[in-house]
Amino acid sequence: MSEAEARPTNFIRQIIDEDLASGKHTTVHTRFPPEPNGYLHIGHAKSICLNFGIAQDYKGQCNLRFDDTNPVKEDIEYVESIKNDVEWLGFHWSGNVRYSSDYFDQLHAYAIELINKGLAYVDELTPEQIREYRGTLTQPGKNSPYRDRSVEENLALFEKMRTGGFEEGKACLRAKIDMASPFIVMRDPVLYRIKFAEHHQTGNKWCIYPMYDFTHCISDALEGITHSLCTLEFQDNRRLYDWVLDNITIPVHPRQYEFSRLNLEYTVMSKRKLNLLVTDKHVEGWDDPRMPTISGLRRRGYTAASIREFCKRIGVTKQDNTIEMASLESCIREDLNENAPRAMAVIDPVKLVIENYQGEGEMVTMPNHPNKPEMGSRQVPFSGEIWIDRADFREEANKQYKRLVLGKEVRLRNAYVIKAERVEKDAEGNITTIFCTYDADTLSKDPADGRKVKGVIHWVSAAHALPVEIRLYDRLFSVPNPGAADDFLSVINPESLVIKQGFAEPSLKDAVAGKAFQFEREGYFCLDSRHSTAEKPVFNRTVGLRDTWAKVGE
């Protein structure tokens, strides 16, 4: 299969293929232009994979440009976080990081050009009046009384705006297009507004800042972008994108193409709603493992490869749709099943004593991966007192229960066959200790007399156990579309985080943050980067061994 045949196909790539074949473009140049006012989420990952992936596949370039035109909401913290997320996902931008603020001088000059052409004017309507004059989807707007000012007056007033002669909200620069346009975005949109705020890149040089629609298209043109890719909500804005470039003196005119945004079940993508979750402390921060942010997914244990694979599978279309959470979980589950070393941890422990076991203990050999001998093996301590999971023992059970039952046998993973003889309980009737015997001739082999022992359970030697905190993360919301609820906070899943105190095999004391393990028979976990200590490691559940929500959706 050729390199071209191996590429994913979608309507954007078909457009690029046609542009290259016709000679319209000889190279491909894309960009990823986030606003640095929050943390990137899984929806941004789709755009990152699309823009950087196209540049990679067509041996072109992709710029990282920060759309930093609103200093009130932006911060250098977000700039650094976004750069880190892009690199973590496995992509590299072309040349230096770019900022829309790099072009503030040129943007100002282009605004003056529009004024000189009679295509922009300074308006002194209040923001509320501008909204009122704009009209509705069914009613045309009406002209501002300031719309027909002379070029000279507009130039003088725009300079007054630039030098701080107006208070915030008292004046703005608007394009002069058509207040009766069926597209509200074309009804004399605001191009510049006043903000007396220090900018993280330009300091206090400016007190007027360009709007997104004016900045975006000019920045694309100045950078030589060939294909400007954005989500469907900007479809109508393409008319303004083209209008600006058609009416200024600029040699390059990129084209904008829209694709559907990523909607994912059981979460929200709105920056406002995500911010509310953080500020109201429903989660512990933007990197909370339940958040759809890239930093949250990373802390939970998602790999960059699994997110890239997810973006590849969902594809690029023009139709909005909602992706099942199971699709994302299946990508990380497949990745970790293939690549994560195995380990044993008991999440809900109960003591098990092997009464006929002699000696202080021994080491048993365990493979790090059952299907990958190249991943090697490890030595795990075994002793006469172990921890097993409470769910792995019953005093009575039916034939479908393949774990330890009173009076019956089960195999301990990679160790011996044991038989439950009796139990000890506390005053409330809870089992505190299970007493067993073991068959000393069954270390990693079947009983000599040929009897069949079907069940296998995991365990941890009590004398060598590493105390661990286990954080069982689940979906943040209890309904597939929380954004549709009257109050999305009312459908937060109360069991989205369950904290357990358990025990793990001692090899896990060397675990590093972000490194994934399969806790045998439990799921995939990674060491938490925020709360773990040498004395008390904290492990986050990334995903279960199987989709436990499958029946919920049926």
UniProtKB/Swiss-Prot annotation:
A motif ('KMSKS' region) lies at residues 268-272. ATP binds at residues 35-37, 41-47, 231, 261-262, 269-271. A motif ('HIGH' region) lies at residues 34-44. GO terms for cellular component: cytosol. It is an enzyme of class 6 (ligase). GO terms for molecular function: ATP binding; glutamine-tRNA ligase activity. L-glutamine binds at D67, Y212. It is found in: Cytoplasm. It holds the Pfam family tRNA-synt_1c. Belongs to the class-I aminoacyl-tRNA synthetase family. Monomer. HAMAP family: Gln_tRNA_synth. NCBIfam families: glnS (TIGR00440), PRK14703.1 (NF011291). This is Glutamine--tRNA ligase. It comes from Escherichia coli (strain SMS-3-5 / SECEC). The gene is glnS.
